[in-house]
Amino acid sequence: MKKANKKSVYFGLTNDIIFGWIMKSEENCLAIIRAILPELNITNIVHKEIQHDITPVTSTRGVRFDAVVQDDQKRYYDIEMQVENTSDLGKRARYYQSQIDNETLMKGQTFHKLKESFDILLSTFDPFSYGLRRYQFHQYEDSIRDLRLDTHSHELFINSKGTKGEISNGLAGIIDVMNQKPNQANPLASKLMKEIAYYNQDSEKRRKLMDYEARLLDERSIGEEKGRQEEGNRNVRNIIIAFKANKAETSYIFQFLKLRT
């Protein structure tokens, strides 16, 4: 009896590599930004960098942007795919904004030259549990909600699990693609799904995807093992502290440690 073939793993838009390939296309990049921010009437992209690493001169800590884009009005967009709810998205957005400012403000320029920027996180979960499909944040005076501080910076979160709020037809299509929901009636969704299907079927592209996933599994396994070791060390330290607090003999503590090795 022949064994049934295992179903191939499908790599969707939320995969880092797939998302990077999609965003390398200027046409896709423009369409996605226009879908998220239709009110800006963006007509052209003049510069984009995909999987762009930034390490500030004053710091050893760098950040990798999934996609950094500049339009013809000199506005900047940082577009990130977020698949894990780390509960620090506010700080993450703040950090990304600061790095965009550092990257775009030339040495010697004053803050007056800061460009308008949009930090966009496409999330596979509802980051704020209000059910909105599109969250947008600005700074307001605490007691006067009509008074907005114009920092020329914007934070947006696209919630693929949301059901509330009016959004563009294009953004609805992007959300369908994130959820791997076929939507042939939506032009943008149909186009993106076809490209993603090609990446999954092309042998060379698929090999790169599988290699990337294997590296992620290795790194996760190493991280988990390291975490277990650190937890074990903390437990031993706490036990030793407890022994000492109860005036245990040193020989007894050594015997305990010997039994654990």
Locations of the language-model features?
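Upstream accessory/linker segments immediately N-terminal to the RecA-like ATPase cores of bacterial MutS
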Residues: 143, 150-164, 173-184
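Short, charged alpha-helical interaction segments and adjacent helix-coil junctions
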Residues: 1-9, 17, 77-82, 168-261
